[in-house]
Regions:
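Short catalytic/signature loops enriched in Gly
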Residues: 201-291
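Conserved ABC ATPase signature
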Residues: 116-120, 124
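ABC ATPase NBD coupling module
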Residues: 5-8, 19-38, 56, 64, ...
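A short, proline-enriched helix->beta-strand linker immediately N-terminal to the Walker B motif
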Residues: 135-139
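P-loop NTP-binding/switch modules centered on Walker-like glycine-rich loops
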Residues: 142, 146, 150-229
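Conserved ABC transporter NBD signature motif
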Residues: 8-19, 75
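Conserved ABC ATPase "signature" region
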Residues: 19, 73-111, 220
Length: 291
């Protein structure tokens, strides 16, 4: 990958009251990435190595990211895969892996560990990704459109599983999606982005029922309905290599003024936990929920 392909010009990335941008890379790798914060990818198939069994790969993760990593065995072991484990360590760690696979509702978990990634279904691979994200006992999981490649029935099962596990384990989930139906099903709080800028942040009910940014309103009205059919948003998404100034939605916004093209709005509080970045927020009105 090319180095220095992007930079952070301003702002903070705050986690548990600390700015992660101030952390040394060693601390980020050892304590944050893959431990306190884990990740569920969009495509689980490409995230597995096809030449190793599922069990081998999960056990490798157990070695490097387990909460017990400070154990002298993990710190000093030169072994890479299962055949280097002392029998007592192997049994304890394998038992924890099997427990996790049962928790994500995978049938016959012992048999699954012996399989290769191509030998299980897409839904099972995504459940394995969820189990691997849970293994370090994280405080936050970033889920990157984890249901995109799944059929509707499996999508519903995965969403229900994520919701249940997050509640039971008290884990925050940052869920990235372009699917408004999925947003309605799983999210407690929603941030709407357009061309890399935050437009509006609101509780889920406020997002669907009282949208305050013109883009949020237009986005919801673009959902097909019996009342207005399919209503698109005029114009095109800007090229991010040279985005428009001010609010990036202003070239397509029916409420835009000259000020919108030169100045980016600050946050305006609409209600508790609901704010919008717009000089001309729309009146509150219900537009219905996604279906």
């Amino acid at each position: 990958l090319p180095e220095n392909s992007a930079r952070i010009d301003s702002g903070v990335v705050e986690f548990e009251g600390e700015n992660l941008l101030d952390k040394p890379s060693e601390e980020l790798s050892d304590k944050i990435r893959g431990r306190a914060i884990t990740f569920i990818p969009q495509d689980p198939f490409s995230s597995f190595n096809p030449v190793f069994t599922i069990g081998t790969q999960i056990m490798e993760l157990m070695k490097w990211k387990s909460p017990a990593r400070d154990d002298p065995y993990y710190a000093n072991s030169a072994s890479r895969f299962w055949n280097g484990y002392p029998s007592t360590r192997y049994e304890a760690d394998k038992g924890r892996v099997l427990e996790l696979l049962r928790e994500v509702q995978l049938p016959e978990p012992e048999a699954i560990l012996a399989k290769y990634p191509h030998e299980v279904s897409g839904g099972q691979r995504q459940r394995l990704m969820i189990a691997m994200a849970l293994l370090p006992e994280p405080k936050m999981i970033i889920a990157d459109e984890p249901t995109t490649a799944l059929d509707v029935t499996i999508q519903a099962q995965i969403l229900h599983l994520l919701r249940t596990l997050a509640r039971e384990r008290d884990v925050a989930v940052l869920f990235t999606t372009h699917d408004l139906g999925t947003t309605y099903e799983i999210c407690d709080r929603v941030t709407v982005m357009y061309a890399g800028q935050e437009m509006e942040t609101a509780p889920s009910d406020g997002f669907f029922n009282t949208p305050s940014h013109p883009y949020t309103r237009d986005l919801l009205q673009s959902l097909p309905s019996r009342e207005h059919g399919i209503k698109g948003i005029p114009g095109d998404i800007p090229a991010l290599i040279s985005p428009p100034g001010g609010c990036r939605f202003h070239p397509r916004c029916t409420a835009a003024s000259e000020r919108c093209s030169v100045e980016r709005p600050d946050h305006t509080q609409i209600s508790e936990r609901h704010n919008v970045r717009c000089f001309h927020p729309v009146a509150h009105k219900s537009v219905g929920a996604a279906s």
